[in-house]
Amino acid sequence: MNIPSIENCDLHNKTVLLRVDFNVPIKDGEIRDVTRILRALPTIQYLVNASAKIIIISHFGRPKARDNNLSLKNVIDTLSQLLNKKVKFIDDCFGEKVQRAVSVMDAGDIILLENLRFYKEEEQSDSNFAKQLASLADIYVNDAFSCSHRAHASISRITEFLPSYAGFCLQDELKYLEKAVSFKAKPITAIVGGAKISTKIKVLMKLTEKVNYLVLGGAIANNFLSFSKVNIGKSFFQNGVDDLLHNILETANKNNCKIVVPEDVLVAVNSDYSTSISRRTESILDGDIILDIGPQTLSTISSIIASSKTLLWNGPIGVFEHSAFASGTIGVMKIVSDLTHKGKLTSIIGGGDSLSAISAAGLADKDFTYVSTGGGAFLDWLSGDEMPGVAALQKRLD
């Protein structure tokens, strides 16, 4: 894909507005997974070495208003430690305080501004908001693939006001995902988990046209089981999607894509998540809540993956946050990792809670061919949808 790269830009003594994705999971004030911060470091370091002045912007969570728990101040210490360099935090995105801080920056200095989503104008793609951000800098760099499916002020609108380039994380994501969706190395298996089928209908339809096996987990699998007249007890599923399910099954059948749903499951009884009970799907009781795949399904999926050349994975198979229901997700993760290390499988993982699931399995990015930081962005890419952030950069070449 042809997009302007920061490597083709004179950065010396220029002020660069760098859009990253620091939307990291935090619990009790502690960052639980630094993957997204780590992915931004090569671009930040490159800008420092090029003697640029760097203003970092990001969103964090979905705040309704200003909220200290969702302030980017929470990531400043971790960012400074990882860079081995002091990063200054400003609790605003524009105004006199920000302008004053920017005006005294030296080459190589780094400032982190406050959460963009503290301002409703960000998600509204407000032109004036984008213009105010742009007024701080000489150059804009997008290094947030995971946000590039959003038509937000700091993602697409801002490119109207500044020379705009792609950072290394964004470039890497596009390179690997382009390779993944070329669908050349077959057989291809796709695993799709998660809660709502309506948010994944386009990607499911696309995958049934391209892959040999479509393995379903999470609440999405519950929908297919229920559609097949299997009792799913009190398990979560989405109402009013039977027509969508019918279309997916019909498309899969037409394209010789085998859809794989659980044949056995691990259930909780009466919302007790501390203990799991294994049941065949035909033996699920009214009070059961399906929270993971069972051992026979894990074995079936393992065999399918072992026969595949390419694997695309979006979303966990079970509720892996509870140890009693982590064996499915972690088991499949380890099989995929093992085959990847042996050079037998190209594995592309992204979206859902994939990053957290990889950590839960005691694995890391290096254990797979590529791990995407994108959730919705990963899905949009697989669906073939235009991504506003990427399209905006491409327009700069026209």
UniProtKB/Swiss-Prot annotation:
Entry's Gene Ontology BP terms: gluconeogenesis; glycolytic process
Pathway: Carbohydrate degradation; glycolysis; pyruvate from D-glyceraldehyde 3-phosphate: step 2/5
Compartments, record wording: Cytoplasm
Gene3D superfamilies in the record: Phosphoglycerate kinase, N-terminal domain (3.40.50.1260)
Annotated positions binding ATP: 200, 321, 351-354
Enzyme Commission number: 2.7.2.3
Swiss-Prot/TrEMBL catalytic activity: (2R)-3-phosphoglycerate + ATP = (2R)-3-phospho-glyceroyl phosphate + ADP
InterPro entries linked to this entry: Phosphoglycerate_kinase, Phosphoglycerate_kinase_CS, Phosphoglycerate_kinase_N, Phosphoglycerate_kinase_sf
One GO molecular-function entry: ATP binding
Xref: SUPFAM superfamilies: Phosphoglycerate kinase (SSF53748)
Keyword annotations from UniProtKB, A to Z: ATP-binding, Cytoplasm, Glycolysis, Kinase, Nucleotide-binding, Transferase
Annotated GO CC locations: cytosol
Binding site for substrate: 21-23, 36, 59-62, 117, 150
Uppermost EC category: transferase
Quaternary organization: Monomer.
HAMAP family in the cross-refs: Phosphoglyc_kinase
UniProt similarity note: Belongs to the phosphoglycerate kinase family.
Protein name per UniProt: Phosphoglycerate kinase
Gene name in the database record: pgk
